[in-house]
Amino acid sequence: KSVDESEAKKIDGYIGAYVNKEGFTRVNTGYVVALGETYWAAEKAAKALKVDWDLGENKNVSSKTIRDESIRLQKDPNSGFLWVLEGDTDKGMKNAQNKHTAVYETEIAYHGCLEPMNAVAFEKEGIMHIHSGHQSFTFAVGNTAAALGVEADKVVCHQYYAGGGFGRRTEPDCHILTAQVAKFAGRPVKLIYSREQDMMFD
């Protein structure tokens, strides 16, 4: 809804705040990014910004509500889809001499990349360049171009096999946000999720 920068402006090296109200996925529906001349200036400023969030339709989503919805959908014969359409599972289970029934659950897990999500972006001669460790640059180019409102040939991703991923680095959020902030700032930027932010946005 609004961002109060008054305390952040007292921090040496603070540049400003980039506000993205649209987001780019159903879950990530908006961001506020603190810009600083150094990482520590930006990190301190991020904590000093007072943001009045519009929490939207996901405001009550939690690990428990996700689990509850999963169980509800599993019990609904009309939800989901079938991978295998052969045989009669119900008949087979009914007539089986030996059966093993169990429920295995685990908590939602953090990917735990070796280094938090980060990227460098800058625009040169009308082309946005993004440098980072990423696992799916084809995906990242298309999504970043769409977020910037340009054709895919106006985005170049430079891939580094670094940082660990475990699947987390297939997501385009860090690329999109870094490119948007670079466009907003009109200068090269390095966007770094703190470890806490990395866990929050995983």
What are these model-predicted stretches?
Residues K1-D202:
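Structural alpha/beta core scaffold segments of enzyme domains
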